[in-house]
Structure formats: structure tokens, C-alpha cells
């Protein structure tokens, strides 16, 4: 079972009204789970609160997991970042449809608890060049 101690966050401020809510939930959760560190894409600097760290996109390639908070476009952007690094991606739907997302902002704390407990499954996806 894979352990997630470094989790990257990908999202776009102008694309999702629920992104700030999701980041607040993550910050609250992270404050009570110090063994898990969160690193947000530097474009989220104004929204990400401590203990979430802000880093450049290149730093996300060293994460154990990427949370893509937004819609399908955000998941695809996270896939581009993860390409060649074998990093799993969890899509968190903060939009209307979210075909590629497995979770919703409303249940984010439970999702993080499940990840920490190892209560998850993965699916391999193909990317066409």
C-alpha cells in the first residue's frame, strides 16, 4: 500500500468557486495530520493557507500524489505535470460535471482520511501524445 506523505495541489483560481473552500478544508485537515505535507501550485499563493506550502510547478514532480481540484481541465493539467513521474492523481470535482473526478469538495476531509487509512483503489489511464 502506497503512503502519501507529500501531496501536491493543482487548481486554477479563475475556474472554480469552490477552490478556496477546498484549500481551507485541506489546511484544517493538515493541521491535525502533521505527517502529511501539502504543496500548492504557486498560482494558488493567495488562497493557500498554512500549513500548505506554495511551490513552483517543477516541484510538484516530487509528490506522492496530486490533488486536482476543479474540473476535467484541471485533471488533465495535473496529468501533464505527473507525466513521466508515475504520480497518482485524485480528481476533486469543484465544478459542475467532472467526469474525471473521483471525489467532491464537500467530502474532501473524508477523502483525505480514506487516503491516509489506505482505503482507496487506483486505475491506470493512458495518455495520448
Description of each model-found segment:
Residues 99-129:
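Catalytic core of DAGKc-family lipid kinases
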Residues 72-75, 79, 87, 105, ...:
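Generic internal hydrophobic packing segments that stabilize the cores of diverse globular domains
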Residues 1-69, 74-84:
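N-terminal glycine-/serine-/threonine-rich phosphate-binding loop
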Residues 86-103:
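Short, acidic/small-residue loops that bind anionic groups at enzyme active sites
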Residues 66, 94-97, 117:
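Generic secondary-structure boundary/loop-capping signal
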Amino acid at each position: 500500500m502506497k503512503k502519501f506523505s507529500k501531496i501536491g495541489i493543482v487548481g486554477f483560481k479563475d475556474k472554480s468557486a469552490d477552490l478556496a473552500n477546498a484549500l481551507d478544508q485541506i489546511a484544517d485537515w493538515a493541521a491535525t495530520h502533521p505527517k502529511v505535507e501539502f504543496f500548492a501550485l504557486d498560482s494558488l499563493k493567495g488562497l493557500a493557507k498554512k500549513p500548505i506550502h506554495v511551490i513552483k510547478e517543477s516541484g510538484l514532480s516530487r509528490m506522492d500524489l496530486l490533488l486536482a481540484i476543479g474540473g476535467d481541465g484541471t485533471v488533465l493539467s495535473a496529468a501533464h505535470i505527473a507525466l513521466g513521474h508515475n504520480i497518482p492523481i485524485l480528481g476533486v470535482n469543484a465544478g459542475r460535471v467532472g467526469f474525471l473526478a473521483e471525489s467532491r469538495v464537500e467530502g474532501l476531509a473524508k477523502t483525505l482520511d480514506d487516503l491516509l487509512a489506505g482505503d482507496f483503489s487506483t486505475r491506470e489511464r493512458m495518455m495520448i501524445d
